[in-house]
UniProtKB/Swiss-Prot annotation:
Family, per entry: Belongs to the TM2 family.
Function: Positive regulator of Notch signaling. Maternal neurogenic factor involved in Notch signaling-dependent neuroectodermal specification during early embryogenesis. Functions cooperatively with amx/TM2D3 and amrt/TM2D2.
Matches recorded under Pfam families: TM2
GO terms (BP aspect): positive regulation of Notch signaling pathway
Membrane topology, from the record: Multi-pass membrane protein
Protein location: Membrane
Name recorded for this polypeptide: TM2 domain-containing protein biscotti
């Protein structure tokens, strides 16, 4: 009987310290997780976040770390805008297959929305097959994408490439060992 009372006392005496914060101010890694994996916010058709806009932003549900309570919702969940890749239905695997097997006729470029280059490849038999080979490499590296500016449909946790670009306005932070 005494061990049962001791166990009940320990169970009810446990204190929880809930911290109420504005969850939109959380910025450090480990304070929250976006998107909340329990909500299933990945669109199965596009393999991107549901509601991804043309500007590359999506509002998703996030979850705060343990013992953090959001003042907006009264629980540990909140919404936040996160970056995403807007897709318009062009699949990378379809484009690669078209480029490998029908690239000499320009079908891959017609599929991506480049009819002029597709017609040029058709008339020159893929640029004497050299243009076809170059297109296969450029499409595999995701340098050539759909003409409407969208991203390829790639599995959400797939081998997507994020290209980091710089121009004359890019500032490179000098390192100590230079």
């Amino acid at each position: 009987m005494f061990p049962v009372l001791l166990l009940l006392l320990f169970f009810f005496a446990k204190e929880t310290h809930q911290i109420n914060v504005d969850c939109n101010e959380l910025q450090m890694m480990g304070q929250f997780m976006c998107p909340d994996p329990a909500r299933g916010q990945i669109d199965p058709k596009t393999q991107q976040l549901a509601g991804c806009t043309r500007e590359g932003r999506a509002r998703v549900w996030c979850i705060a770390a343990n013992e953090i309570n959001c003042t907006e919702t009264g629980n540990a969940t909140f919404t936040r805008e996160v970056p995403c890749k807007w897709t318009n239905g062009y699949h990378l695997d379809t484009t690669l297959l078209l480029s490998v097997f029908l690239g000499m006729f320009g079908v891959d470029r017609f599929y991506l929305g480049y009819p002029g280059i597709g017609l040029l490849k058709f008339c020159t038999l893929g640029g004497m097959f050299l243009g076809q080979l170059i297109d296969i490499v450029l499409i595999a590296l995701q340098v050539v994408g759909p003409a409407d500016g969208s991203a390829y449909v790639i599995p959400y946790y797939g081998a997507g490439i994020h290209i980091v670009r710089s121009d004359n306005t890019t500032y490179r932070l000098p390192r100590d060992d230079w």
